Amino acid sequence: VITRFAPSPTGVLHVGGARTALFNYLYARQHEGNFLLRIEDTDKERSKKEYEENIINGLAWLGISYDKLYRQSERADKHKDCLQRLINRGLAYEAEEGKDGSGKVIRFRNPGAKISFHDAIRGNIEFDTTELGDFVVAKNIDTPLFHLAVVVDDFEMGVTQVIRGEDHISNTPRQILLQSAIDAPHPTYAHIPLILAHDKSKLSKRHGSVSLVEFRDKGYLPDAMVNFLALIGWHPEGSGELFSMNDLVKEFTLERVQKGGAIFNIEKLDWLNREYLKKMLPEEFEKKVIEYIPEKFKKSDKKISERMLKNIALIIVERINTLSDISAMFESGEFDYIFERPTYDPRKLLWKGTPDLLVTKQRLDKVIELLQEIDEENLTGDTVKETVWKYASSEGRGDVLWPMRFALSGKEKSPDPFVLVSILGKEESLKRLRYASETLIARNS
């Protein structure tokens, strides 16, 4: 088995191309075959090196490795030789082009045969090729065009399966005619469904991000992206939705690829990415947190300690879809309380229906007393909860935990007070609780 992914370097790698590459890769690896990357760069005006690099880097990011790389432009002599043989045999000829006949092209002499082929996804497909006429295969002897170059390359590279988008179905009869003309075997074709937007139109830039690099830069994980791409149009046998690359190599079959268009569901991608973020080892996720924290929060006066980082990571992983959400959380001021002691109106320390400042102060003082008993080395959200919970339950959880949380963060919405203590540390937490107690005295006097 030999499959190939054959992109043109006239733009960046988009999700549709990435999925095509993935399906070809999975099929080849499952059958212990080879997966080829063929850069179809014969359009000299539009092909650019940076787009080729983008394609190669995108595949590498996804973990899709190819067995050999070809550039179509480096095979021009082989295309030219084949074209000349077709002309010599009378199977192609030079023809005038344009109304004034000033231009010349080379056309394939179409025998007008009826063609049928079995598509591994769509079943039998038939074409009456008389409708195609004598189609153009080259601008001139030195410039063969798409159909001829593809047929020659697939033949010489031994490609056995052509897995590509359904928009290529109309190309297939021309390519089968050319294969017969050069005595090349017909590969097995499998035309996968187009990727559609939520409105069921073809996915495009107007629907948002479509290039692979945009999703990478937004902080989606490659494993999540691979999992997501595989599920666009392919349906596994069981009910499971989480698949590693190794799982996909074992499970993927063309028979379970749907014929109709497949919807690009960004909510599904976000869900998958969250699942993969949660599966990361804590130390790996902590490295990602550091990577995505804005630079201004890494200065010496705002430096996050290792303990802080571990506890912040526990909060963040439950609340983000992508890694770039980490930057947004810091930039929005959500974690400002970590770096600066909050200031606030003391009345906000009061829980619902608790007008008595003195009672609230007494409860904060008791929390201070309890926290002093905890060894700094054993300070975790769990140990803080164990220490405070019994007292909070006896007094009324809201009456104790609300002023404790607000004193630590100055925010009505923040992590629970046990986690806050574990982030801020014992010393800083006690300072903030004492400050809150003092403001209540001042307010009461």
Question: Predicted segment positions?
Answer:
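Active-site cores that bind ATP or allylic diphosphates and position pyrophosphate for catalysis
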Residues: 72, 88-205, 211-215, 236, ...
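Conserved phosphate-binding loops in nucleotide/dinucleotide-binding enzymes
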Residues: 139, 157-168, 196-228, 232-241, ...
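Short, basic, low-complexity termini and linkers enriched in Ser/Thr/Gly/Pro
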Residues: 441-445
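Glycine-rich phosphate/pyrophosphate-binding loops
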Residues: 29-41, 149-161, 182-196, 415-420, ...
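Small-residue-rich helix-loop
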Residues: 282, 286-393
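Charged substrate- and nucleic-acid-binding regions of tRNA-handling and nucleotidyl-transfer enzymes
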Residues: 375-440
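Residue-level signal for inorganic ion chemistry
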Residues: 24, 55, 86, 108, ...
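N-terminal Rossmann-like or analogous alpha/beta NTP/dinucleotide-binding catalytic cores
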Residues: 1-97, 171-184
